[in-house]
């Protein structure tokens, strides 16, 4: 007969007293703190601290994110978390001009900011104008519209394509204007499901030498069409960094369907995946895969 006596020493729990953030001259503290999964006053968790560091790094606002956990003076069961960030430029203002024999002078301008006033909100404004092409768009996204991470975004756009000025075979003109709203719902630590609904109006002018596919479109749907595309997507981001990823993956599954009541009946689906594999300290292998499918329904073709 053999008897065993087990003695278990659970050790001492270590708590996080305070989280200190430095280096964020523009970005507000709350933008960084809301990405932390390690809470003040909670038990110290290496897993939660590493996860928090990755989430802050994936924001794309910082060149570097460093985390230290020094012990609190005269305390054996408490530590502080010191996070030091180095901010990077998150906005851009661009102006451009070009020239081609067919389109003549082409002008473009854009303003974008991924971190407006340090709030973490995104805004962009784009304008492009040429002899045959005009595009204008504005976009805004609040990634934390609610405290639990529900995002809200708006988009508006106008696109004009007029090939008559090319003075070549196949003249037509399209004029599209639209606007939409987007909502993102986090369903897991690295997973987000997004829903969107837009309304757009497209006018098509065809002429004597217009391509047959545009003539067929106007014959089937009319010169002016109204469309209400509903979109749904799932995205997963497990990269180690948004700026310079060296490992991890991203996945995106996207679907779009025209809502009944509009002039178009179609659906589209696509899947996009990226892999990152570290080869050396200076080289990373990047593999990209993408495929999609679309068709019409209710007896109509995919436009």
Which residues make up each language-model segment?
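Gram-negative/organellar outer-membrane beta-barrel architecture
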Residues: 26, 42-244, 249-250
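Extended, domain-scale alpha-helical bundle/helix-rich regions
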Residues: 4-14, 25
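Periplasmic plug
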Residues: 21, 32, 84-87
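Secondary-structure transition into beta-strands, especially the periplasmic turns and strand N-termini
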Residues: 186-191, 279-285
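Extracytoplasmic assembly/pore-lining segments of large envelope/extracellular complexes
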Residues: 263-267
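N-terminal periplasmic "start-of-domain" segments of outer-membrane beta-barrel proteins
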Residues: 26-41
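Extracytoplasmic gating/loop element in the C-terminal half of outer-membrane beta-barrel translocons
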Residues: 79, 284-303
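Outer-envelope exported proteins of Gram-negative bacteria
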Residues: 196, 252, 286-290
């Amino acid at each position: 007969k053999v008897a065993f006596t087990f003695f278990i020493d659970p050790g001492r729990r270590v708590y996080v007293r305070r989280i200190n953030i430095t280096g964020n001259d523009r970005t507000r503290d709350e933008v960084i703190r809301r990405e932390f999964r390690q809470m003040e006053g909670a038990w110290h968790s290496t897993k939660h601290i590493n996860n928090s560091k990755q989430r802050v790094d994936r924001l794309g606002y910082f060149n570097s994110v460093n985390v230290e956990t020094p012990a609190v003076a005269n305390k054996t069961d408490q530590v502080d978390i010191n996070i030091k960030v180095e901010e990077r430029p998150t906005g851009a203002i661009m102006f451009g001009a070009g020239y081609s024999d067919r389109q003549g002078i082409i002008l473009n301008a854009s303003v974008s900011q991924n971190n407006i006033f340090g709030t973490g909100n995104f805004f962009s404004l784009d304008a492009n104008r040429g002899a045959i092409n005009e595009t204008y768009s504005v976009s805004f996204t609040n990634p934390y519209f609610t405290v639990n991470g529900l995002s809200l975004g708006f988009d508006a756009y106008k696109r004009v394509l007029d090939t008559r000025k090319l003075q070549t075979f196949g003249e037509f003109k399209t004029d599209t204007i639209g606007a939409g709203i987007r909502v993102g719902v986090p369903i897991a630590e690295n997973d987000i499901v997004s829903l969107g609904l837009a309304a757009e109006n497209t006018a098509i002018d065809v002429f004597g030498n217009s391509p047959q596919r545009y003539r067929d479109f106007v014959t089937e749907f009319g010169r002016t069409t109204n469309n209400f595309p509903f979109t749904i997507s799932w995205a997963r981001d497990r990269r180690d960094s948004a700026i310079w990823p060296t490992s991890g993956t991203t996945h995106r599954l996207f679907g779009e369907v025209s809502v009944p009541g509009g002039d178009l009946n179609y659906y589209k689906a696509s899947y996009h995946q990226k892999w990152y594999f570290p080869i050396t300290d200076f080289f990373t292998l990047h593999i990209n895969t993408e495929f999609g499918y679309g068709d019409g329904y209710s007896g109509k073709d995919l436009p």
